[in-house]
């Protein structure tokens, strides 16, 4: 059996139609007895864990931009600073699509620092 590199597989997937990809996904799930569940569903199931989950201190936080406020340009600049590798257009789109997660799975210190910077720029931010 030929061994394909990840790049070769991606190129093959690019040539497939959406219907073909869906059929492939279903066959993959059946063959390996797995499901392609969205990560959000896993996080929601974990949050529904009850009191045991509440007793544990969270070590990963999501920084959610609830509202950009009146000083949108300043918030866009801070978003570019907080989220590495983000261009001006991407940062603007992110700010305008609030409420939106800016950082996901950040450490407590990083999340608090990002929240402080964004709030100083005039944004309404929450940690989840």
Swiss-Prot record:
Gene Ontology MF: a single term: mRNA binding
Keywords of the record: Ribonucleoprotein, Ribosomal protein
Please name the Gene3D superfamilies in this protein's record: 3.30.1390.10, Single helix bin
Q: Name one GO cellular component term.
A: cytosolic large ribosomal subunit
Q: What biological process terms from GO does the record include?
A: translation
What protein family is recorded?
A: Belongs to the bacterial ribosomal protein bL12 family.
Q: What is this protein called?
A: Large ribosomal subunit protein bL12
State the organism named in the record: Corynebacterium kroppenstedtii (strain DSM 44385 / JCM 11950 / CIP 105744 / CCUG 35717)
Recall the taxonomic lineage recorded for the source organism. Answer: Bacteria, Bacillati, Actinomycetota, Actinomycetes, Mycobacteriales
């Amino acid at each position: 059996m030929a061994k394909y590199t990840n790049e070769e597989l991606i190129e093959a997937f690019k040539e497939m139609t959406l219907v073909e990809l869906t059929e492939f996904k279903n066959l993959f799930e059946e063959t390996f007895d797995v499901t392609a569940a969205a990560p959000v569903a896993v996080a929601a199931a974990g949050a529904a864990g009850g009191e045991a989950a509440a007793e544990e201190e969270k070590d990963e936080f999501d920084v959610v931009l609830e509202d950009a406020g009146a000083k949108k340009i300043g918030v866009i600049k801070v978003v570019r600073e907080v989220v590495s590798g983000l261009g001006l257009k991407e940062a603007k789109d992110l700010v305008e699509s609030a409420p939106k997660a800016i950082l996901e799975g950040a450490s407590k210190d990083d999340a608090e620092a990002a929240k402080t910077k964004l709030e100083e720029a005039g944004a309404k931010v929450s940690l989840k």
